[in-house]
Amino acid sequence: MSAVAPRSRLSLYLDLIRWNRPAGWLVLVWPTLAALWVAADGFPGWHLLAVFVAGTVLMRSAGCTINDIADRDFDRHVKRTTQRPITSGQLGVREAALVGVVLTLVAFVLVLTTRWEAVAWSVPAVLFTILYPFTKRFFAMPQAFLGIAFNFGIVIAFAAVQGRVPATAWVLWLANLFLVLAYDTEYAMVDRDDDLKIGMKTSAITLGRFDVAAIMGFFVLCLGLTAWVLAPYGLGWPLWLGLGVAAAQVAWHFTLIKDRTREGCFTAFSKSHWIGAAIFAGVALGYLLR
């Protein structure tokens, strides 16, 4: 471990887990909370709320660490990522790996306070999180794999509340898989030129000139599946208002990404968590007023 002042070391750890960019974990928190509310048929209680908020943030942070370790040689050639702690040499791989392990263990301890079914589902969640960065070497749509990894929180939420994973959970999982495909393709559009040079595979490269149309299609599938699976739950106008606000944001995203500028695509990605927030607000308010 290099001789770096403790305050500076903490700053590097926070940079490693993207603590200064909450959009990255908010895109995961909102769908997970919406699933938790549906699974519990309303407010799930403070214990589960705390477990899933903290667990989601911890696992996303661990995922960032794993991603940076796996991509450290590629990140040197990407304009946006050259100064990340591992890539720039400010943190060693072993030290970063230790950070990731600690974060994962803390998240696992939190899950242990729930049902064993939730604990069981947390194992593949960790495995997919570890494997995701390596799919960018050979899989044409690694964002789809990311969607699988990101949305285990939905499955685990139902397992923690109900001790099972019903069809509703899987439809919500699929809906949010499309949401991840949408916003992470926006993110991939930011780095497309650099990724082409270094041979990285992304959905933005695979989709080519159909990228914007595909993103809009992914958003529509997300909202459509969410509306379809939640309509029977009697959540009334709050659900439809939330979905309407989310749809309005999708329209705004189109204006941001249609010209494919780095700035517009990054803005779209960084604001994408508001779509999940609108849906969660509709679900939570619907249960409150039901």
From Swiss-Prot:
Listed Gene3D superfamilies: UbiA prenyltransferase
Cofactor(s) listed in the protein's UniProt record: Mg(2+)
Function, in words: Catalyzes the prenylation of para-hydroxybenzoate (PHB) with an all-trans polyprenyl group. Mediates the second step in the final reaction sequence of ubiquinone-8 (UQ-8) biosynthesis, which is the condensation of the polyisoprenoid side chain with PHB, generating the first membrane-bound Q intermediate 3-octaprenyl-4-hydroxybenzoate.
Gene Ontology molecular function, alphabetical: 4-hydroxybenzoate polyprenyltransferase activity
Pathway recorded for this protein: Cofactor biosynthesis; ubiquinone biosynthesis
CDD domains listed in its UniProt record: PT_UbiA_COQ2 (cd13959)
EC number: 2.5.1.39
Record protein name field: 4-hydroxybenzoate octaprenyltransferase
Pfam families, per database record: UbiA
Organism of derivation: Acidovorax ebreus (strain TPSY) (Diaphorobacter sp. (strain TPSY))
Superkingdom, taxonomy of origin: Bacteria
Keyword Cell membrane: yes
InterPro entries: HB_polyprenyltransferase-like, Prenyltransferase, UbiA_prenyltransferase, UbiA_prenylTrfase_CS, UbiA_sf
Family: Belongs to the UbiA prenyltransferase family.
Leader sequence segment: none
Keyword Cell membrane included in the entry's annotation: yes
